[in-house]
Amino acid sequence: MIAHIQGRLVEKSPTDVVIDCNGVGYHLHISLHTFSLIPNSENIKLFTHLQIKEDAHTLFGFVEKSEREIFKLLLSVSGIGASIARTMLSSMEPKQILQAIATGDVVSIQSIKGIGTKTAQRVILDLKEKVLKVHDLDEVSMSSNNTNKDEALSALEVLGFNKKLAEKVVEKIARENPDATIESIIKQALKNL
C-alpha cells in the first residue's frame, strides 16, 4: 500500500524515526541495521512495510529494499511477528540471516532473543528453499572473496576431509572471525571435523 516515504527527518532513535512528508509526520519502526545506515542528512527515503491490524496501522521502515524483503519473508513464518522479525534484523545483518537460513544454522537463529529451537527450525524449514531460489545462494557457502577461507578449504581437502563438511565448518569459522588467518582457520576446522 505504501511503498516508501521520502521527506524530512524529524526524530531518530535506534527503534524508530519520524519523517515529515508534506506536513504529515509518519512514525516508522526501524531495526538497528536500518538505524546504522540512516544518513545524518535532513531529507531521507525509507522503503516501508505497512502492517494493518484491528487496533493499529504500523509502518516499518528500511534503508535497503533487500532488508524489507527479508522482513516480509520472516513474517510469512508461523510464530514470527513483526517485533520478532525486527529483533532478528537488529541482532544480525540481513546477509547473516540469509546465510544462516541457507546453511541451516539453527544455533545462530536461536541466539536471537525471543526465538527458541522450534521457531528457529521452522524459520529454516519454511524459508530455506525460498532463500536459495530467490537470493541465488549456494546451499553450503555464499560467494565470498575471502582467499584465506578458500586456501584453508583446499588444504583441508588435501588432508582428505569431505569437501561439503569442510565447507560448512570453514564457513562458520570465517563468519565468526572474518579476519582469521589461514593457519587459525585450519586449526579451528581440525578441532571441529
Task: Describe every region a protein language model picked out.
Residues 1-76, 181-193:
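Structure-specific DNA junction-binding interface
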Residues 85, 97, 120, 166-169, ...:
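Small-residue helix-packing motif on alpha-helices
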Residues 161, 167-193:
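C-terminal, charged interaction/regulatory segments at domain termini
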Residues 1, 70-76, 85-88, 100, ...:
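Residue-level recognition of specific faces of alpha-helices
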Residues 57-62, 82-101, 122-135:
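Amphipathic, charged-and-aliphatic alpha-helical interface segments
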Residues 123-173:
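Strongly charged, low-complexity linkers/loops
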Residues 77, 91, 103-104, 130-137, ...:
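Conserved, well-folded catalytic cores of nucleic-acid-processing
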